[in-house]
Swiss-Prot record:
Phylogenetic placement of the source organism: Bacteria, Bacillati, Bacillota, Bacilli, Bacillales
Organism of derivation: Bacillus subtilis (strain 168)
Protein name listed in UniProt: Lichenan-specific phosphotransferase enzyme IIB component
Keyword Transit peptide on entry: no
Function: The phosphoenolpyruvate-dependent sugar phosphotransferase system (sugar PTS), a major carbohydrate active -transport system, catalyzes the phosphorylation of incoming sugar substrates concomitantly with their translocation across the cell membrane. This system is involved in lichenan transport.
Pfam families reported in the protein's UniProt record: PTS_IIB
Enzyme class: transferase
EC number assigned by the record: 2.7.1.-
Cellular localization per UniProt: Cytoplasm
UniProt GO BP: phosphoenolpyruvate-dependent sugar phosphotransferase system
Residues annotated with Phosphoserine modification: 37
Domain comment, as recorded: The EIIB domain is phosphorylated by phospho-EIIA on a cysteinyl or histidyl residue, depending on the transported sugar. Then, it transfers the phosphoryl group to the sugar substrate concomitantly with the sugar uptake processed by the EIIC domain.
Gene: licB
Length: 102
């Protein structure tokens, strides 16, 4: 599964990406997880199975949902508490539910 995260500058989610990768690894799952800034999404969405937005870029949801629909990629906003506490396991679970992967 390829999980693309979007944040304001592509940097604020780097710790969350690390925590998600660790959680996936502990579960024996071979996922690719990366973060980009909002203006870079179009260059990466073709490689993604799901697209998750950081709460700080929630305002981009309508625009990115349209893009996701045109590419067959489900889009949602990361739970604010899970994002704020850097809960990689819960964000990973959300991505799997969004992408219908167990």
């Amino acid at each position: 599964m390829n999980i693309l995260l979007v944040c304001a500058a592509g940097m604020s989610t780097s710790l969350l990406v690390s925590k998600m990768e660790k959680s996936a690894q502990e579960q024996g799952k071979d996922y690719t997880i990366w973060a980009v800034s909002g203006d870079s999404v179009q260059n990466h969405i073709d490689k993604a199975d799901v697209l998750l937005l950081g709460p700080q870029v929630r305002y981009m949801l309508p625009q990115l949902k349209k893009l996701g629909e045109s590419k067959g990629v489900p889009v949602d906003v990361i739970n604010t508490v899970h994002y704020g506490t850097c809960n990689g396991a819960e964000v990973l679970k959300s991505a799997e539910q969004l992408g219908h992967v167990s």
